[in-house]
Swiss-Prot record:
It comes from Saccharomyces cerevisiae (strain ATCC 204508 / S288c). Pathway: Porphyrin-containing compound metabolism; protoporphyrin-IX biosynthesis; protoporphyrin-IX from protoporphyrinogen-IX: step 1/1. Present with 5350 molecules/cell in log phase SD medium. It catalyses: protoporphyrinogen IX + 3 O2 = protoporphyrin IX + 3 H2O2. This is Protoporphyrinogen oxidase. Its EC number is 1.3.3.4. It is found in: Mitochondrion inner membrane. Belongs to the protoporphyrinogen/coproporphyrinogen oxidase family. Protoporphyrinogen oxidase subfamily. Its cofactor is FAD. Optimum pH is 7.2. The keyword Flavoprotein applies. Changing L422P: In HEM14-1; loss of activity. Its main location: mitochondrion.
């Protein structure tokens, strides 16, 4: 949350609505920080884990396979990733942690150019030259060279779209239509002309605000690093969230710092069995906590109206069950879902929360056993599709799961090996839709058949996979309905208004987290948000 929280009273009762990774981790951290507090976690589905879903199924021959239907990797440089990995170590599960080495083929990333050819995102001199000679590289040199000379926003501190700030800073719209649009489609499933620069493109936004330009920010940062280099070499310390985490749980600071530095060496991290391994491990740990109760498959339908002199809060479930006298309610579901739970006397708050729409993402998994049909030159993490491509299939991007899985290495369990390393198979996940599905703000989802046929056409055109191999493969179709809040221009101002209105209505009884209220929708960020708020409530 943006606003501060106050300490819970002794033996307080807490309700958590939403059993995704945000709700699970908030519950885990708070239950450890305050064992006296009784926590009840409510999840509408029969499983916890939310949008992190590593689906264990079988192929057409009856052999077990795992298909990722959500996020699958983590960035090693994130503080939230350190919290995840340290939690796994605490629970004796560090053997599941896997890494992708720098320079590994699985770290290669591609963009789709206007002629439907894959172009590697530069990571060397030769790939930089190829990129600059491609239409995707148009405007890049002149845009970067002239960036220092271009004027700041005429309205400093005012939010604007990512497209607007990029076009102003780089002096053309090629960069935003090509590289930037592809990147943000992959993260947010949305359009650069709509996304908030202040929310989703913070570095560029604040570089201009504080330094005047990105070039000047780079110069100033280099000077600062040069001055502090000797000090850093002598004494490196934990900062921010990791410092608070170390203090809160009495961690060995040097070991936590070593873990953080180790993880930063790797561009990507993952978990054996898929990323859902983490929420499953946390759920299993919570099942053993005496102060935690988990209710699944019985959605909360209402936050009960309370008398003016009442300080506790109650919930009503779909079954008709009522859960009363909670001292604190944590909501980790999306803003529109929160709006549906509010009593009628909170109509103005409901309308405010309903202002935020969400994008729907369609996921299509393709699996072909015993054959690798991705060309050797195109092996990598996958590719994203920029606005500059005509893109009739409304494709956001494609992830090459089989390439990633074959190149994972156990990070801490050096004696074990990757069982997929020598296996020949093809596994990819296509991401479709997002903002491109929306008609008048409402997602219109095409049928399974139409969507899979569009993905087949894309894989044939972009990767050269034959129709025979496409027809021989196994296909899975999943709709992640309204899974990603739309972080449009003005989102931060909206969030502050919403949180203030919540506190006006409920005081310190209600807090919010999850994708709609954390720094970003990424898994590490919602976990950091959950820890920070659990810490405030525990002090």
């Amino acid at each position: 949350m943006l606003l501060p929280l106050t300490k819970l009273k002794p033996r307080a009762k807490v309700a958590v609505v939403g059993g995704g990774v945000s709700g699970l981790c908030f519950t885990y951290f708070l239950s450890k920080l305050r064992p006296d507090v009784e926590i009840t976690l409510f999840e509408s589905q029969n499983r916890t884990g939310g949008w992190i879903y590593s689906c264990n199924t079988r192929d057409m021959s009856g052999n077990p396979i795992m298909l990722e239907k959500g996020p699958r990797t983590l960035r090693g440089v994130s503080d939230g990733t350190v919290l995840i990995m340290d939690t796994l170590k605490d629970l004796g599960k560090e053997a599941v942690i896997q890494s992708i080495d720098k320079g590994c083929i699985a770290d290669k990333k591609f963009l789709l150019d206007p002629s439907d050819k894959l172009v590697q995102v530069p990571n060397s001199i030769s790939t930089t030259v190829k990129f600059l000679l491609n239409p995707l590289g148009k405007g890049l040199i002149t845009g970067m060279m002239g960036e220092w000379f271009r004027k700041k926003s005429p309205h400093p501190g005012q939010d604007e779209s990512v497209e607007s700030i990029c076009d102003r800073r780089f002096g053309n719209n090629y960069i935003s239509n090509n590289m930037i649009s592809a990147l943000l489609r992959g993260i947010y499933g949305d359009d650069v002309s709509l996304l908030s620069a202040k929310r989703t493109f913070k570095k560029i936004y604040y570089n201009e605000l504080k330094h005047g330009s990105n070039t000047q920010a780079m110069i100033d940062n280099m000077r600062g690093k040069s001055r502090s280099k000797k000090t850093e070499n002598l004494h490196q310390s934990l900062t921010g969230c990791l410092n608070d985490y170390s203090n809160a749980f009495g961690k060995d600071r040097s070991k936590l710092l070593d873990l953080s530095n180790t993880l930063k060496k790797y561009p990507m991290l993952g978990l054996a069995g898929g990323l859902e391994t983490f929420p499953k491990i946390v759920r299993n740990a919570l099942n053993e906590f005496k102060n935690v109760k988990i209710v699944t498959g019985n959605p909360v339908t209402q936050i009960m109206k309370r008398p003016a002199n009442e300080t506790t809060i109650g919930l009503k479930a779909k079954s008709g069950d009522q859960y009363e006298t909670f001292d604190h309610l944590r909501l980790t579901i999306t803003p529109p879902k929160i709006a549906k739970l509010l009593p009628k006397d909170q109509n103005s708050l409901s309308k405010l929360l309903d202002e935020i729409q969400s994008n729907t993402i369609i996921l299509v998994n393709y699996y072909l056993p015993n054959k690798d049909v991705i060309d050797a030159d195109l092996q990598g993490f996958g590719y994203l599709v920029p606005k500059s491509n005509k893109n009739p299939g409304k494709l956001l991007g494609v992830i090459f799961d089989s390439v990633i899985e074959r190149n994972f290495k156990p990070l801490f369990d050096k004696l074990s090996t990757n069982p997929n390393a020598l296996n020949k198979y093809t596994k990819v996940t296509a991401m479709i839709g997002g903002c491109m599905l929306n008609e008048h703000g409402v997602p219109v989802v095409p049928s399974r058949e139409v969507t899979i046929n569009a993905v087949k056409d894309a894989l044939n055109n972009h990767l050269g996979i034959s129709n025979k191999d496409l027809e021989a493969g196994q296909w899975e179709f999943t709709i992640a309905d309204r899974c990603l809040p739309r972080f449009h221009v003005g989102y931060d101002a909206w969030q502050e208004r919403a949180e203030r209105k919540l506190q006006e209505s409920y005081g310190q009884t209600v807090s919010v987290g999850g994708m709609g209220f954390s720094r970003s929708p990424g898994v590490p960020d919602v976990i950091v948000d959950g820890f920070n708020d659990a810490l405030q409530l525990s002090k």
